[in-house]
């Protein structure tokens, strides 16, 4: 039983590294330069979900299937905890989580063929999630670079450490 608890703790620690990496990416001030207002929780959450969708897209494989499912579960549990900390009640949290899950799955679907899309198609996809942002083309370039950088690193790299964008 000791070994099992230890391995669960280690895996949770690894998953928190991925969660924290995604949070760090979504806090990148450069992402918000074309926003004509103060950023808010919803903006940061949208960027978190977009980053996470690209992360899953890049590392999706049969051999990573189980661990990516655990990372997915862990990240959405962490999001739920964050929403609770803001002070929402249970019913409100359930509604919000359903909205966020639907948003996430829409993003996953929209970026599935990202590398095959033209720049204008990418602009259209991102702008549907980032309506208040002006210079979406900068964000398209950012996410192209982000995916390129993900492809240069292993999943294990993100499990082991927290990086700053």
Residue ranges of each PLM-predicted region?
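Surface/interface-facing alpha-helical segments and adjacent flexible terminal/loop regions used
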Residues: 1-165
